[in-house]
Amino acid sequence: ALRTLIKAREQGLVHAVGLSGKTVEGGRLALSQGADCLMITLNPEQSDEKPLIDEAKNNGAGLLVKKALGSGHLTASIPSIFKDLFAHPSITSAIIGTISPVHLRNNCLALPTEIQQ
């Protein structure tokens, strides 16, 4: 599937391609085949894919983090999670799941000030 997406990128049909390899090995394979970005799971309790942070940076690829807040089950403070997460320049986005607009607003307000700007 990734090869097909890369062909579409080469033809100018899409700007960038990426995937969630679900493992470090899957992420490495995607990077070696030319992925522009990876989606990884990363939070204080799930860090198996953390080695991909530097590998993505070294390959010029971006990172989208899923489950950054552990689906609401983490005990760490949200501001500290965001601070640690966005300390890595290759992490370009994070999926911040929520159950309500108020919860989303509170999550956004927990972002460190320098990230909000």
Per-region residue spans from a language model:
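Beta/alpha (TIM)-barrel catalytic core signal, keyed to glycine-rich beta->alpha loops juxtaposed to Asp/Glu
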Residues: 1-117
